[in-house]
C-alpha cells in the first residue's frame, strides 16, 4: 500500500516506503480500497494474500470505471445530465460539448469495449 493512502479517514504518511499489510487489518484496507487500490508485489510467495486484498478491495468499491476512454465517457454522461438543468441555449452548448467528449472516447477502436462498459456502469 502506498504510504499516502487514506486509511480510516486520515491521511497516513509513514517514513517507511513499504507498510506491512498485516499491521493494518482488514477494515483499514477496505477503507483505503474505497478510494483507490495500489498494490506493489514485493514477495511473490504471498500471492494468496495479494489475491485476498484485491478481492476485498473490489468488493468495497461500488463502481469501477475502466480505462481506455472511460474518463471521456463518464464526463460525457455527467455533462448530458447537467445540461438538462440549464436553459435552452446553455443546454444546447453543454450537450454539444458532451457529444464531443463521447466522440473522443469512441475514436480509437481498441478503446471501444472499455468505453461501452463504462457507459453501462455509469448509466
Swiss-Prot record:
The record lists the catalysed reaction(s) as: ATP + H2O = ADP + phosphate + H(+)
Cellular component aspect of the GO annotation: centrosome; chaperonin-containing T-complex
The residues forming a coiled coil are none
Q: Which domain of life is it from?
A: Eukaryota
For this UniProt entry, the molecular function terms from Gene Ontology, in alphabetical order, are: ATP binding
Q: Enumerate the UniProt keywords alphabetically.
A: ATP-binding, Chaperone, Cytoplasm, Cytoskeleton, Hydrolase, Nucleotide-binding
Q: Which InterPro entries match?
A: Cpn60/GroEL/TCP-1 (IPR002423), GROEL-like_equatorial_sf (IPR027413)
Please tell me where ADP binds in this chain: 68
- Report the locations given in the UniProt record: Cytoplasm, Cytosol; Cytoplasm, Cytoskeleton, Microtubule organizing center, Centrosome
Query: Does the entry feature the keyword Coiled coil, yes or no?
Result: no
Gene3D superfamilies on file? GroEL-like equatorial domain (1.10.560.10)
What this protein is reported to do is described as: Component of the chaperonin-containing T-complex (TRiC), a molecular chaperone complex that assists the folding of actin, tubulin and other proteins upon ATP hydrolysis. The TRiC complex mediates the folding of WRAP53/TCAB1, thereby regulating telomere maintenance. As part of the TRiC complex may play a role in the assembly of BBSome, a complex involved in ciliogenesis regulating transports vesicles to the cilia.
Q: Record's family? A: Belongs to the TCP-1 chaperonin family.
Q: What is said about its interaction partners and assembly? A: Component of the chaperonin-containing T-complex (TRiC), a hexadecamer composed of two identical back-to-back stacked rings enclosing a protein folding chamber. Each ring is made up of eight different subunits: TCP1/CCT1, CCT2, CCT3, CCT4, CCT5, CCT6A/CCT6, CCT7, CCT8. Interacts with PACRG. Interacts with GBA1. Interacts with DLEC1.
Q: Could you tell me what this protein is called?
A: T-complex protein 1 subunit alpha
Origin species, per record, is Mesocricetus auratus
Amino acid at each position: 500500500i502506498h504510504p499516502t493512502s487514506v486509511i480510516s479517514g486520515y491521511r497516513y504518511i509513514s517514513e517507511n516506503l513499504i507498510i506491512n499489510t498485516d499491521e493494518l487489518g482488514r477494515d483499514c484496507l477496505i477503507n483505503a480500497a474505497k478510494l483507490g487500490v495500489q498494490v506493489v508485489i514485493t514477495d511473490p510467495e504471498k500471492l494468496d494474500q495479494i489475491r485476498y486484498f484485491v478481492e476485498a478491495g473490489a468488493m468495497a468499491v461500488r463502481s469501477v470505471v475502466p480505462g481506455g476512454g472511460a474518463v471521456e465517457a463518464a464526463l460525457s454522461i455527467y455533462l448530458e445530465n447537467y445540461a438538462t438543468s440549464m436553459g435552452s441555449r446553455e443546454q444546447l452548448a453543454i450537450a454539444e460539448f458532451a457529444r464531443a467528449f463521447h466522440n473522443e472516447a469512441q475514436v480509437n477502436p481498441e478503446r471501444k469495449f472499455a468505453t461501452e462498459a463504462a457507459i453501462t456502469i455509469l448509466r
